[in-house]
Amino acid sequence: MENAKMTSLIAQYPLVEDLIALKETTWFNPGTTSLAEGLPYVGLTAQDVQDAHARLARFAPYLAKAFPETAATGGIIESELAIIPAMQQRLEKEYGQKISGELLLKKDSHLPISGSIKARGGIYEVLAHAEKLALEAGLLTTEDDYSVMLSPEFRQFFSQYSIAVGSTGNLGLSIGIMSACIGFKVTVHMSADARAWKKAKLRSHGVTVVEYEEDYGVAVEQGRKAAQSDPNCFFIDDENSRTLFLGYAVAGQRLKAQFAQQGRVVDADHPLFVYLPCGVGGGPGGVAFGLKLAFGDNVHCFFAEPTHSPCMLLGVYTGLHDAISVQEIGVDNLTAADGLAVGRASGFVGRAMERLLDGLYTLDDRTMYDMLGWLAQEEGIRLEPSALAGMAGPQRVCRSTDYQQMHAFSAEQLNHATHLVWATGGGMVPEEEMAQYLAKGR
C-alpha cells in the first residue's frame, strides 16, 4: 500500500498503527447489534442449522462404525467441557488481573477423528457432499441406516469422485481423513506453514498432499484452480463455504445441552463470554453464529488472532473485509499459530458476523507459548499454540471498563459470568513436537 493511502487509513482507523507495530491490540466493536437486528445479514437461519443437526444424526450410525472412537457417543462428534480453576488463578497471578466469574475450556482440541475444531465443519461438509451424490444416484434415501455407506458398493461409487481443499493444516486433516474413509480421492493443498506431522498423517491415509512455499491464500487458490478443470472434483472452499459454516454452527445447541446437564445458567444476569481463535474465520464464525442462535443476546463472542496475522480484526475494523490483507499494511503473516496464519479474512464471514461480535483482539506468539506451558503445568491439558489464542480474552474483558460500560454490565453480572475459551486443536500433536512447544513457554 502506498504511503498516502496508508496515512489516510491510519487517520481514519488509528488502531491500524498498533497492528502494523505488532502490538497486542484489543478492539471492542461499537457496531454490535441485537441478534434480531444482526441475524438477517448472516444469510443463514436457525432452520439451516437444524438441517445440519439432522444430517449429522443421520450419519451417526456410519461414524460410530467407521471411527470406533466415536462409538461411545453413538457417532456424534462432540468435545467435553473442562472447568479450569487452577489456570484461572495462574492467569490472575501472571497478569495481575482478576477474572470475574468462572473459566471453562471447550476441548475441541480433543475431538475424535482429527483432534481439532475442524472435525466439526470439515467432516460435515464431506458428509453433506457424499449424501448429496448418493441421494442423486438413487443409492440412498434419508430414511436408510447410513452405515450402508461402509459397503464396497458405496466405496466403489464414491471412488469416481474427488475432493480438494486448501489448508494450513487442521482443516486438511479433517477433510482428508473423512474423504479417504468414504472412498473419495482427495487432494489437500498445504501452505508453507503447515506442520510436517500433519502432512505425514494425511499421506498415511492415502491422501495426496501438494505443498506450497507460499501462504494459505495461495494454497486455497491453487486448490480451487485444480478442481475447476475436473467436473467430478468438489472443492471445499474455506473462505466462502456456507456448508462448512453450518457444520461449525451445530456447536451452539450442543453446548446449550452440555450447560443444561451441568445446571449452568446463561441469561441476562449470568452472561456467557466466548473466546474463539480465528484464522480465515469459518470455524469461529460458524460457532459464534450457532452460539448466538442458542443463547441470543446473553452470549458475547470474541475472535482472537496472532499479532502477525490479524486479518479479521483488520477487515472488520476497517470495514474493508477481504479487500485488504495484512501484507498490505506490512505485516508478515508468519506465526507459530499455524492454524491462524491467514493474511486475508473471509469476506463472507466478516460481513455475516460483524454485527454479532463483541470484539476482536491480537496476541503475541510469546503469550501463546507462555499460556500453553501454564495450562500444561496447572491443568495437565496440552494444546497447540493457536488453541491458546482464546485464553488471553477473559483478562481483556475484565480489564476494560469501557467495554463493561458499553454493555452496561454490573459487577454482579460479571461475578456470575462464564468465560469459555474455545481450545481449537492439539489433541493429536506428536510427543516430540509437544515437547518443543512446552520448552518455549516460560
Curated annotation (Swiss-Prot):
Record-linked PANTHER family: D-SERINE DEHYDRATASE, THREONINE DEHYDRATASE, MITOCHONDRIAL-RELATED
Keywords (A to Z) from UniProt: Lyase, Pyridoxal phosphate
Source organism per UniProt: Citrobacter koseri (strain ATCC BAA-895 / CDC 4225-83 / SGSC4696)
Subunit and interaction comment: Monomer.
InterPro entries, per database record: D_Ser_am_lyase (IPR011780), Ser/Thr_Dehydratase (IPR050147), Ser/Thr_deHydtase_PyrdxlP-BS (IPR000634), TrpB-like_PALP (IPR001926), TrpB-like_PALP_sf (IPR036052)
Reaction it catalyzes: D-serine = pyruvate + NH4(+)
N6-(pyridoxal phosphate)lysine modification, residue list: 118
Name used for this protein in its record: D-serine dehydratase
Cofactor(s) this protein requires: pyridoxal 5'-phosphate
E.C. no: 4.3.1.18
Enzyme type, top EC level: lyase
Domain of life: Bacteria
A Pfam family per the record: PALP
GO molecular function, a single term: hydro-lyase activity
Family classification: Belongs to the serine/threonine dehydratase family. DsdA subfamily.
Gene3D superfamilies referenced in this protein's UniProt entry, alphabetically: 3.40.50.1100
Gene: dsdA
GO biological process, one term: D-serine catabolic process
